[in-house]
Amino acid sequence: MSDTAEKLDYSTTLYLPQTDFPMRAGLPQKEPETVKRWQDMGLYKKLRASAAGREKFVLHDGPPYANGNIHIGHALNKILKDVITRSFQMRGFDANYVPGWDCHGLPIEWKIEEAYRARGKNKDEVPVNEFRKECRDFAAGWIKVQSEEFKRLGIEGDFENPYTTMNFHAEARIAGELLKIARSGQLYRGSKPIMWSVVERTALAEAEVEYHDVESDMIWVKFPVKDAAPALSGVSVVIWTTTPWTIPGNRAIAFSSRVEYGLFEVESAQNDFGPQTGEKLIFARKLADEAAAKAKLTFKFVRDVKSEELAAITCAHPLASLGYDFPVPLLDGDHVTDDAGTGFVHTAPSHGREDFDAWTNSVRTLEARGIDTKIPFPVDDAGFYTEDAPGFGPSAEGGAARVMDDNGKKGDANERVIKALIAANNLFARGRLKHSYPHSWRSKKPVIFRNTPQWFVYMDKELGDGTTLRSRSLDAIDQTRFVPASGQNRLRAMIEGRPDWVLSRQRSWGVPIAVFADEQGEVLVDEAVNARILEAFEAEGADAWFAEGAKERFLGNDHDHAKWQQVMDILDVWFDSGCTHTFTLEDRPDMKWPADVYLEGSDQHRGWFHSSLLESCATRGRAPYNAVVTHGFTMDEQGRKQSKSLGNVVAPQDVMKESGADILRLWVMTTDYWEDQRLGKAIIQTNIDAYRKLRNTVRWMLGTLAHDNGEEIAYADLPELEKLVLHRLSELDKVVRDGYDAFDFKKITRALIDFANVELSAFYFDIRKDTLYCDAPSSLKRRASLSVIAKLFDCLVTWLAPMLPFTTEEAWLSRYPDAESVHLAQFPEIPAEWKNDALEAKWEKIRKVRTVVTGALEVERREKRIGSSLEAAPVVHIADSDLLAALSGQDFAEICITSAITVVGDEGPADGFRLQEVAKVVVEQKLAEGVKCARSWRITTDVGSDPQYPDVSARDAAALRELAALK
């Protein structure tokens, strides 16, 4: 052995990976430093400057509520938005993200009132604008907190200039939008039964309620027939209801001409109250036996009762003796079924939408019958009966009965009504029922339906162009892209079935309904007055409306101050958020209208998507968005709703502190986000494991590229294997771009992770490690591989950058220390020549044979006949001409990572290794012949052929000589 060989440490002659990019990520420590670096370097402004003049892409941010720390739903939502905007920015668009906040409304009022109570302060004694200032300050504080939390998630946007609904300009624009609606005749004051929160003392929209199971009283009530054909004289119609307190509001009974009804006679009675033997009652035939059982009666069927007979009936109110001395007609209603109850529906137009519709749709018929069609106001805003409920109102013995108290608990109304029905001998039966009932989503307390004067927007009024707000909205839905597609039908069904839009709320913290109205509800339309209002709001905010002397200031001297009343209700906060497109998309020069995308949770079909659609269609005739993307809710690992009581809440702050924001982001990217997702410790660990593999792939590339001198090898000079990798990059480029366009991030992450793990780490990198580590500096194969790995790195890191902004930034700066940020880069443009389907088809065959060889090697390893695949020199028997042809000219030993390999075109031995799915390939195992190379560890017969380096192969000896010459 020569002196050179004796002294040489071969490990120093290898091109082993070298990088400062650590295997251990340390994301919780590094990510905050990266956020600070981005802020210090002004990354957001650099992104805007780099995108100047490009086509705009706008994802309009649905505003979270400025109240409390962010939760996992916020994190999911913001990460999805961030990935979308980043992906468009890196594909040649100007994708500006402007975060926003919803600032008005009841939850903030509650917090301020809570603080008042703690200090013994009475809210009613506080000047309204002082109260509003405290609400404003509260919201501003939480905007600051949430901004920092969003930035910690890696969200990039204009946090220095967000939009807020309490900004003076925003308040002026919101008021201006209302005035547009008023000017077009779409705004009106009316009375309708609406959902009312007694606890919060305000009207609620459908979007502000959630449904919970409750147990309620249910009663069956007799309505004595007062006027009918002689054959039905002396009988009673029986209704069923789960809201006994609404009986004072009853004005009609609904039946259906599609239901079969019958007259029944009581044969026996075993009850303490209710019908007695001989009484005659009308029921839906299908439900009579069930009703009889509830009342402990036996019935005898007398005869059928036709719908024509029912339509001619007028009943007495069951509480007529208390002052309800008016006729109760029977009305044919489409909403009536014989699925439950009695087949008759108690109709209280003050307390239900269907009841209201049934009553108002029959006004002409009722008036022709001499029936008063005025709708009463039986319940006040505190849940007490009014004088419109004789026997239960303020003048009743014991005072006014109450439906619900200030804490959302059931009052005494049900029991007092039931006792009165028993006293009148008109209670048929009573019981308890568990059913779904609306609750306020804020207070979590039940709501009631009550008739109140409110401000509405017409859904079905003709708007002068042959359209209505409903028809415009439905047309707009048809022109909108929905992801998932099911969202279209969901929103369509809501618009088709919704009532007129209730805009008014009886609270203080919000944008006022800044109009003047007379006693009849007629709205003053005067452009000079409107201009004064909007000018004041722009300068002072909506507080100007509540300031002393506001009425005189805005009306001026042109109008009778006694005639015109200043409306002091505020707007539904959904109207606020429904107007964000005006003062964000239209008014900001860095945005555009309409937005390309609105993205929110699936509950926003009845919330922000809904209100934005209505507002924009009312004022502009189309939706403010081109596409609507929805995500589901985050459950725990068992699929249960996350709640503090279950102890299963996953806070994003905790995940970031323990694992890092990129882990949370990877979880979002790997879920079917449009459905409900699951999250917990095991799922987080799964994502940590996937992240580590991905990180190690990037780390290996960085280490290998430490030896890259930037040389780019011409495509024509590349070996087939490198061309195959570039073909796969070409295919992945389409998957990535199509995936980002379709908002299908799971498809992208699955494709990239599989590519990194299966095609790179377990195939291409494995095959090329020997070349990359051991070949001579001048080796074309080594240089070609480095050239391709450089392209792999650029593609993978930029493709992943929208999803994993922290990790990709770290990797990019490790590779390009002089670069500012990966996020200022663009996705690489892929040359058309990279796509090579014929080459892929050929290599599919090669890989098929390789699968059999690696399977055979695994058996040899398991049986401990070899330790490494380099100890093997298998014989591969192939009885398939296509497979054989594919291997022609290939260094198949290199591809299989063996020291040698022999390919034979025959059937092979019967006892050889084979796989069922590749039946015509048989592997016969043999050990490699020769000596193990001290440098590459391959076993070859030419070790010792070079006297200068007698313990290495000829290839390695040549490489060593070349390396020595370079020193």
UniProtKB/Swiss-Prot annotation:
Reaction it catalyzes: tRNA(Ile) + L-isoleucine + ATP = L-isoleucyl-tRNA(Ile) + AMP + diphosphate
Motif ('KMSKS' region): 641-645
UniProt short sequence motif 'HIGH' region, positions renumbered to this chain: 64-74
Compartment(s): Cytoplasm
Keyword field contains Aminoacyl-tRNA synthetase: yes
Coiled coil: none
Quaternary assembly: Monomer.
UniProt remark on domains: IleRS has two distinct active sites: one for aminoacylation and one for editing. The misactivated valine is translocated from the active site to the editing site, which sterically excludes the correctly activated isoleucine. The single editing site contains two valyl binding pockets, one specific for each substrate (Val-AMP or Val-tRNA(Ile)).
Name of the protein in its database record: Isoleucine--tRNA ligase
Lineage: Bacteria, Pseudomonadati, Pseudomonadota, Alphaproteobacteria, Hyphomicrobiales
